[in-house]
Amino acid sequence: MKIYKVGGAVRDRLLGIKVTDIDRVVVGATTEEMLAKGFKPVGADFPVFLDPKNGDEYALARTERKSGRGYGGFVFHASPEVTLEEDLIRRDLTINAMAEDDDGNLTDPYHGLRDLEARILRHVSPAFAEDPLRVLRVARFAARYAHLGFTVAPETLELMRQLSESGELEALTPERSWKEISRALMEDQPQVFIQVLRDCAALKTLMPEVDALFGVPQPEAHHPEIDTGVHTLSVLEQAALHKQPLTVRWACLLHDLGKGTTPVDKLPQHIAHEHRGLKLIKAVNERFKVPRDCQELALLVGQYHTHGHRALELKASTLLELLQSFDVYRRPQRFEEFAIACEMDARGRKGLEQRIYPQADYLRGAAKAAREVAVAPLLEKGYKGPELGEALKRERLKALKAYKEQPIL
C-alpha cells in the first residue's frame, strides 16, 4: 500500500499557494484493508474513505469508463492492480495530474510541472471530452489563476469547443452547473470565466442571454467601451475588485440582459431594457435553480439600476416607491447591495473606473431617513391596520422630501 497527495494540494504547493484541502490516493490497497485500518467509508460511487483522526480524504486508485451521457455517465473500477499513472490519467488537466509521496518525491507522468511553469491549462488526454462539467472547471481555473498568467492551451480550448457544440452541456444538472458558476464568480477575476466560456462556445448554450450582449452597441457618450458584453464583464470585474458577495456579482452579470433584445433599428439606445430584461433574468435564475437571495437581488437590480443612477433626480415619491420595492425597512442589507451594484455598473465603463459615484451614498441617506420615521407616535394617535400603513407612508414621504432639500455634500 502506497499513499500519495494528488491534485490541488500538489499543484498549489508548487505554485507557492497555501494548501487548504489535501486529497490522497491509495495504490495497492483494498476496501477491506482500509476498513481494517479504521478508515470510514464515505464514497457512494467509488471507494473513498475518511481518516477518523483528522477527517482527511483517501480514495483508492481507480479507472473510469464512459457509459452514458453527461458528467454522471461513468463506470468506475478500483482495485489494488490500478497503478498511480492509470489513476492520474483520468484527471482533467496536467497540472492536476501530479502526485507526491510523503518524502516530497513528485510523480508527473503527463508533464504537469512543465505546464505549471509555462502557465498553461492543458487537458491530460482525449478522455477530457467524456465529462462536460470539465468545460466549466477549466474556465474556473482560468479565472482562479489568471493573475499568475495562466491561459488555456489552444488544443484544450478546441476540445472544449467541440464538447460545447456536441450538446453534452445540456446533460449537466442545474445543481452541478450552479456549483461551478458560483465558485467561479467568487474568484478574483470572474470575468475571465465568462470570457473563456464564450471563447469555447459554451456561453451561448449555458447562458445565451449573456452571450447575446456581445456586439450590441451602447451610446459612446455614456459607455466609452460601447460593447454591452464588454461592459458586463467590466462590471463583474469591478464587483470582484471591491470584494463583493455572490449576490452582487450575480446581479452585476445579469443586470443588462434586456439590452440583448433591443431592436436593431433602435440601437444604440436601449429604452425600457430594464423591463425587457426581467423575464430573461428570471429564465437564467430558474435554469440553474439559483438561491433565492441571488435571484431576488438580480431581478431588483435589473429592474431598478437606472433608478439608482438617477437617484439625485428622483422625486421623493419615486424614492419612497423604490425603498418599498426593496422592503428596505425589514431587509436593509438588500438595498445596500443594490446601491453597491449600481456603483459597480457605473464603474464598469472604460476610463471611468475611478469616478466618484455619489448616488450610492445618496440612496443610503434616503433609506436612513425613511427608516428613522417612528411608528410609536402614530400608534399613540390611534392609527392601526391599513390606516397605520398609510400614515406611515405619509410620514416617510415627508421625511424624504426634507431629505431632498438638504445640500448634497
Swiss-Prot record:
EC assignment: 2.7.7.72, 3.1.3.-, 3.1.4.-
GO biological process, one term: tRNA 3'-terminal CCA addition
Residue numbers binding ATP: G8, R11, R91, R137, R140
InterPro entries per UniProt: CCA_bact (IPR012006), HD/PDEase_dom (IPR003607), HD_domain (IPR006674), NT_sf (IPR043519), PolA_pol_head_dom (IPR002646), PolyA_RNA-bd (IPR032828), tRNA_CCA-adding_enzyme (IPR050124)
Keywords: ATP-binding, Hydrolase, Magnesium, Metal-binding, Multifunctional enzyme, Nickel, Nucleotide-binding, Nucleotidyltransferase, RNA repair, RNA-binding, Transferase, tRNA processing
Cofactor: Mg(2+); Ni(2+)
Cofactor: how bound: Magnesium is required for nucleotidyltransferase activity.
Transmembrane annotation, as ranges: none
HD domain sequence ranges: 228-329
A single MF term (Gene Ontology): phosphatase activity
Binding site for CTP: G8, R11, R91, R137, R140
Role played: Catalyzes the addition and repair of the essential 3'-terminal CCA sequence in tRNAs without using a nucleic acid template. Adds these three nucleotides in the order of C, C, and A to the tRNA nucleotide-73, using CTP and ATP as substrates and producing inorganic pyrophosphate. tRNA 3'-terminal CCA addition is required both for tRNA processing and repair. Also involved in tRNA surveillance by mediating tandem CCA addition to generate a CCACCA at the 3' terminus of unstable tRNAs. While stable tRNAs receive only 3'-terminal CCA, unstable tRNAs are marked with CCACCA and rapidly degraded.
Domain commentary: Comprises two domains: an N-terminal domain containing the nucleotidyltransferase activity and a C-terminal HD domain associated with both phosphodiesterase and phosphatase activities.
Remaining remarks: A single active site specifically recognizes both ATP and CTP and is responsible for their addition.
Annotated protein name in UniProt: Multifunctional CCA protein
